[in-house]
């Protein structure tokens, strides 16, 4: 089987890094097209031996990109097209159908209750998504929670397949030597209580809650923020206003897989932490929380379908917290005073092993390739309405 993956961009983000990890485990010849921003993940894919093409799309309404994408698909001789993220799903599914490819799969990585990929949901966004969804054969939800959201939109249940995000368990396994080396490299005191936060620095992630919580914790507590984005300067100002700027470390965007760039990779940073916080009130999956669990960390979160969709006993040291600095400060103070537990990987993290996700996705591919040709139907009025 030969597959083409179409994604909106390849900067450092959860969906982008998930695609790179998946391609390492899929027994499929795969190429990648990025509509925009061939960033660090594009470089990583090329290093992995994947052919990456930058379409050079100027914006959401750059209709001239559509015929370029159609020509690229036709020339590639692909058996299947797999799209990722909103813009790539809308343009990619249409281009694939025009190019004559009928086996089309799309993954919905980032659908919240009121936003998608950090943007507010509108009737127009839903309507366009549903119209393009009919052009494919399967829509992959990264969690049962996302599946329910898609069904409420009007996507028929039989068209939705749940394939959770996956992680490389061995890569995130706790390593005490790596912890010591990473703390020394970052200038973190060896005996400091280090709170971790991982993700895009956008307003919706609510990392400001974690920053303000630090003002209520003892001076030996640090906040290690891993990620980049438009809210970094806002968070720095918030830290200064709260009087904790000297105890907050911005590590920037860090690769999932070591790529030779200066600075530790994401698993090393996880080893350096004592607890992970996720103050985001809307998540489609909660990949950072699962990665933290794989490293044996306690997790305190506001929304995390990856944890909530599993039995309660799957992970012992996880707690749901309200999105409030005082609530986070209180639960972090409890973690700080408890004797440290062995950093073992719980069942919840093992449930999301990347090889398991790759196997499930291959089943979706097989079904999409074998399915009979059907004409796309118009989206229902129910699906288009807010």
Name each model-derived stretch.
Residues 313-326, 334-337:
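Conserved acidic donor-binding segment of nucleotide-sugar-dependent glycosyltransferases
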Residues 236-260:
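Nucleotide-activated donor-binding/catalytic signature segment of Leloir-type glycosyltransferases, i.e.
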Residues 73, 253-254, 261-264, 268-273:
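Short alpha-helical donor nucleotide-sugar binding micro-motif in glycosyltransferases
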Residues 34, 298-302:
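Short hydrophobic beta-strand element within catalytic cores of glycosyltransferases
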Residues 281:
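Aromatic "clamp/platform" in nucleotide-sugar-dependent glycosyltransferases that forms part
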Residues 5-64, 149, 229-230:
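N-terminal strand-loop element at the rim of the active site
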């Amino acid at each position: 089987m030969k597959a083409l993956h179409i994604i909106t961009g390849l900067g450092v983000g959860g969906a982008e890094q998930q695609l790179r990890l998946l391609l390492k485990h899929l027994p499929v010849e795969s190429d990648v097209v990025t509509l925009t921003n061939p960033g660090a993940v594009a470089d990583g894919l090329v290093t992995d031996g994947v052919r990456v093409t930058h379409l050079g799309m100027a914006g959401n309404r750059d209709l001239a990109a559509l015929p370029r994408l159609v020509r690229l698909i036709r020339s590639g001789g692909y058996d299947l097209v797999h799209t990722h993220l909103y813009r790539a799903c809308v343009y990619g599914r249409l281009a694939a159908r025009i190019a004559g490819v009928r086996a089309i799969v799309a993954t919905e990585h980032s659908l919240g209750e009121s936003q998608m990929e950090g943007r507010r949901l509108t009737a127009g966004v839903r309507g366009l998504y549903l119209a393009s969804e009919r052009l494919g054969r399967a829509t992959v939800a990264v969690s049962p929670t996302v599946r329910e959201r898609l069904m409420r939109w009007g996507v028929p249940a039989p068209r939705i397949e749940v394939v959770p995000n996956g992680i490389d368990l061995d890569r995130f396994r706790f390593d005490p030597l790596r912890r010591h080396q990473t703390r020394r490299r970052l200038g973190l005191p060896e005996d400091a209580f280090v709170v971790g936060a991982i993700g895009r620095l956008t307003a919706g992630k609510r990392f400001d809650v974690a920053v303000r919580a630090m003002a209520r914790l003892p001076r030996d507590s640090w906040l290690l923020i891993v990620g980049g984005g438009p809210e970094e300067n806002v968070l720095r100002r918030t830290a200064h206003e709260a009087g904790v700027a000297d105890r907050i470390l911005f590590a920037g965007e860090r690769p999932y897989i070591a790529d030779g760039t200066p600075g530790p990779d994401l698993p090393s940073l996880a080893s350096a932490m004592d607890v992970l916080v996720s103050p985001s009130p809307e998540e489609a999956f909660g990949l950072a929380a699962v990665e933290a669990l794989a490293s044996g960390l306690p997790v305190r979160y506001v929304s995390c379908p990856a944890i909530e969709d599993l039995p309660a006993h799957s992970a012992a040291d996880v707690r749901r917290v309200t999105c409030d600095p005082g609530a986070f400060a209180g639960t972090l103070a409890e973690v700080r005073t408890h004797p440290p537990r062995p950093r073992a990987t719980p069942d919840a993290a093992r449930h999301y092993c990347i090889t398991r996700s790759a196997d499930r996705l291959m089943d979706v591919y097989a079904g999409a390739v074998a399915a009979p040709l059907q004409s796309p139907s118009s989206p229902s009025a129910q699906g288009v309405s807010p």
